[in-house]
């Protein structure tokens, strides 16, 4: 289970990005267990991305994120 601020960006049906508390350039990529329970508040961490001026520096342990070439953060 991942604790994160409610700074979520919807990428596709089940994949979101959330900001780590207190970490400026570090975001975690995770999925919600909607396929099991629509009301579930369970999140499974898929990996971490590191940003600098909204440019992705590196992606660690994120499967299926290669097709998302540009991720815009509010």
Spell out what each predicted region is:
Residues 1-74:
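Conserved RNA-binding domains used in RNP assembly and mRNA/RNA metabolism
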């Amino acid at each position: 289970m991942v604790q994160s601020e409610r700074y979520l960006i919807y990428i596709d049906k089940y994949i979101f990005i959330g900001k780590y508390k207190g970490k400026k350039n570090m975001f975690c990529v995770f999925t919600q267990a909607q396929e099991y329970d629509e009301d579930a508040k369970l999140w499974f961490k898929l990996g971490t991305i590191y940003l600098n001026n909204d440019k992705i520096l590196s992606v660690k342990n994120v499967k299926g994120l290669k097709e998302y070439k540009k991720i815009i953060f509010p």
